[in-house]
Amino acid sequence: VVQDVLDYFIRKKAQCLAAGINDVIIDPGFGFGKTIAHNYALLKKLSVFHLLNCPLLVGISRKSMIYKLLDSTPVDALNGTTVLNTLALQQGAAILRVHDVKAAAEVIRITEYMQKV
């Protein structure tokens, strides 16, 4: 699935550039028509999308890939969301789409600090 999504974005980015659209953000689309295994494979290989030289947006907050794996509910999946946001940031995600802003801000602050030490 990772190669399929990467190939899709390679084509779409070329179309954007050909149309004069230069500001492109890549969102791998966690949860959209993918299995839980597909979503975790995308997250595990998120760094390959840097080949596109575009900022990466990750929207995994409260997704079924978290709460189903944890046998929880979307509202109760904050710990799982925090873990996956951390993993995404460690692989170079530039933008997080979140529901729980305070928790995400703390993840960003700690992750940025860890990258400096």
What do the predicted segments below correspond to?
Residues V1-A18, N22, G33-V117:
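Active-site-adjacent loop and "lid" segments of alpha/beta metabolic enzymes
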